[in-house]
């Protein structure tokens, strides 16, 4: 019976996590002025680097939350915090680089790499700072 309880807990956290990632990607792509999905479909490396780094920057703290959450509502709360942190990282990079979206649209790989790296760094720091 213990294995079934473990499988149920795994399934709950995994599928809730997948749903939170999908919701995050939807919200993030609606917040940014450029259309990441279309740019990536059009082989825009800068957009791919930025969006991939952002995805990792969200999934890392979400994974930390899955490991340490004491309940499903706790997991949701930390997932929400990770989402907000990624939006703040994007806003911060745009303060530093106001033409970020235009640079990404114009295939500026350095701008895309910087955005992706900033998002990844924000996610790693976010995961490290999660306390219970």
Swiss-Prot record:
The chain crosses the membrane at residues 7-27, 47-67, 72-92, 110-130. It comes from the Bacteria. This is UPF0719 inner membrane protein YjfL. Belongs to the UPF0719 family. InterPro entries: DUF350. Residues 28-46, 93-109 are cytoplasmic. Its main location: membrane. GO terms for cellular component: plasma membrane. Pfam families: DUF350 (PF03994). The gene is yjfL. Keywords: Cell inner membrane, Cell membrane, Membrane, Transmembrane, Transmembrane helix. Residues 1-6, 68-71, 131-132 are periplasmic. It is found in: Cell inner membrane. The keyword Cell inner membrane applies. It is a multi-pass membrane protein.
């Amino acid at each position: 019976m213990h294995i079934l309880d473990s499988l149920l807990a795994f399934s709950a956290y995994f599928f809730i996590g997948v749903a939170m990632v999908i919701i995050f990607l939807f919200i993030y792509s609606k917040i940014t002025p450029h259309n990441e999905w279309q740019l990536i479909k059009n082989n825009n490396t800068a957009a791919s680097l930025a969006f991939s780094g952002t995805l990792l920057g969200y999934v890392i703290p979400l994974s930390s939350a899955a490991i340490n959450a004491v309940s499903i509502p706790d997991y949701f709360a930390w997932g929400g915090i990770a989402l907000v942190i990624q939006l703040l990282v994007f806003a911060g990079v745009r303060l530093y680089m106001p033409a970020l979206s235009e640079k990404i649209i114009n295939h500026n790989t350095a701008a895309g790499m910087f955005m992706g790296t900033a998002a990844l760094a924000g996610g790693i720091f976010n995961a490290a700072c999660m306390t219970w």
